[in-house]
Regions:
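Alpha-helical transmembrane bundle of multi-pass membrane proteins
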Residues: 2-22, 29-286, 290, 296-538
Length: 538
């Protein structure tokens, strides 16, 4: 097989699909993963010339703007990490969920896998995502009509209020109200921030900039783990209040910073059609006066979008079918990797394996370190190696680690008694390997790819659908995991492993490469794809 292929998508399609008509055996699949990196560089070099390389450079202005916006990732990550930590604190369980605490401490007959099975406890975790589903659709209208900046600001304010109520909670009802407000904040932030980052970033560095959102999300999880580890040592039992209330710190930074964020040139053209103002902003963020080609593409995309004012009515059309499928499939698969199970319930999971409260929280901190480090690596290499290569390498890594964890637990963790220390630490290492695989692939890319595939006329609707689907399945997984763990026991890891295998095959066959392609010319990848070209016509 020759690696040097012409820079044409029809030959790209022939290479990938005509010569591989069936499902590949494992050796061929792995070989193609390795080949992908080599020929992608050649392919993308030609595509950059065909589709427009706007030039420009990374400026401090765009770096600081994107860093401020990406603080929203810390909010989301902190919430993911904090809920599982406080749910394993004895003082928190005694006050709000006494039945769970009694079952954990005194019921010797209950299975290891069922100690934390409580619908009320899962509502505490999952209610945030129910609110986020609704909020994401309201956020779409605000983003389209008023710009990305007001949506980010509204998300910060909602999160700030929710954090204060959570830290001051006196009963379960106050906890749930706080979680609902946090969900509104996260829904607004997740709908607008990835869009903001994609539109502000230079084309050749869009992957790195947008992956920064996942980096800050992982930093939020890590920060939450450190806070939980420290606050559970407070003897008087109010450490959980500190854990919940400290979410106000990044919320305050985001709210204050959003006041000074510039709007993107894309949003300025879409809302006001002020071409001169958009050109000045584009020159400022690109660090060059030669921005006319990029500006013309933005204007052309905006004109197409004004023909169809209601993007939610437009997105079901056949010509947008690939983007709609990805807006649903990518967040669906992302949640079924099982990563949020680790994020939400890692301390509970580690306690199930036999670790003490303090040790389980420390193990969660280390998991956060691994996740953050792997996401930083992804940020550095995603624009060089491409999205598809990282998706597949990370998918294989997650699949193998989950299968081995499932086998160990099936053989050595029974309904009663702790897992032997040697096996427990081995499972811990495998959890870290799984977290690293996610950090290289579905973590950052699950947010990056959806943020860059939508044409301007459907962009806000597409991101709203993506965020809503993400929240829906996050809610579903969070709400059902403890019951599934009780029912499936070790089989829960085979369940998620099967989904990882399916999603890796989905990426291999149906997701085209999106790297190094101007965001306003992304529609071409579907026209040149072996399958999606059947739906997309000029």
């Amino acid at each position: 097989m020759e690696l040097a292929i012409p820079y044409k998508y029809n030959l790209h399609r022939q290479y990938l699909y005509s010569q591989l008509p069936g499902i590949p055996d494992p050796l061929a699949f792995y070989k193609d993963c390795l080949l992908l990196v080599s020929w992608r560089r050649q392919l993308m070099a030609g595509l950059a010339n065909e589709r427009g390389d706007y030039g420009g450079k990374i400026t401090w202005f765009v770096v600081m703007s994107c860093m401020m916006a990406a603080v929203g990732g810390i909010l989301f990550g902190y919430d993911i990490g904090i809920s599982g930590g406080v749910s394993s604190m004895e003082s928190f369980l005694k006050k709000f969920f006494p039945s769970v605490y009694t079952k954990m401490e005194n019921d010797t007959k209950i299975s290891n896998y069922c100690k934390f099975d409580s619908q009320l406890l899962t509502v505490f975790t999952s209610s945030l995502y129910a609110a986020g589903i609704v909020a994401s659709f309201f956020a779409s209208s605000i983003t389209r009509s008023y710009g990305r900046k007001p949506t980010i600001l509204a998300g910060g304010i909602s999160f700030l209020v929710g954090s204060a109520i959570g830290g001051a909670a006196l009963d379960v009802y106050m906890l749930i109200i706080a979680r609902l407000l946090l969900g509104i904040g996260v829904g607004f932030a997740n709908q607008s921030i990835p869009l903001y980052l994609s539109e502000m970033a230079p084309m050749n560095y869009r992957g790195a900039f947008n992956t920064g959102y996942q980096v800050t999300l992982d930093l939020g999880i890590l920060f939450a783990g450190l806070v939980n580890y420290g606050s559970q040592k407070i003897k008087s039992g109010w450490g959980w209040r500190l854990s919940l209330a400290l979410a106000a710190a990044p919320a305050f930074v985001l709210t204050l910073g959003a006041l000074f964020l510039p709007d993107t040139p894309n949003s300025l053209i879409q809302r006001t059609n002020d071409q001169e103002k958009a050109k000045v902003m584009l020159q400022k963020i690109r660090g060059t006066i030669d921005v006319q080609e990029e500006l013309d593409d933005i204007i052309e995309a905006s004109r197409a979008s004004t023909v169809n004012e209601n993007s939610f009515k437009e997105i079901p059309r056949w010509k947008y079918r690939p983007q709609l499928v990805m807006a649903i499939a990518l967040p669906f698969f992302q949640q079924l990797t099982g990563i949020n199970v680790i994020g939400f319930y890692a301390p509970i999971l580690f306690r199930t394996l036999g670790f003490a409260e303090s040790a389980s929280l420390l193990s969660t901190v280390l998991s956060g370190v691994v996740g953050t480090a792997s996401t930083v690596i992804a940020m550095l290499v995603v624009d060089k190696f491409g999205r598809r290569a990282l998706f597949m390498f990370g998918g294989i890594q997650m699949l193998v680690s989950q299968l081995i964890i499932g086998i160990i637990l099936a053989l050595h963790l029974k309904d009663h008694g702790d897992l032997e220390k040697g096996y427990a630490y081995f499972v811990l290492v495998l959890v870290y390997i799984f977290a690293a695989g996610f950090g290289l692939s579905w973590g950052p890319l699950g947010w990056l790819v959806p943020s860059e595939i939508f044409q301007m006329e459907i962009r806000s609707a597409g991101m709203s659908i993506f965020v809503a689907v993400s929240f829906f399945f996050t809610f579903a997984v969070a709400q059902t995991f403890l019951a599934m763990l009780c029912s499936f026991k070790s089989g829960i890891f085979f369940f998620f492993g099967g989904w990882v295998a399916l999603m890796t095959a989905f990426v291999y066959w149906l997701l085209p490469e999106t790297g190094n392609i101007p965001i306003e010319k992304m529609d071409q990848i579907w026209k040149d794809h072996w399958f999606w070209s059947k739906f997309v016509v000029d």
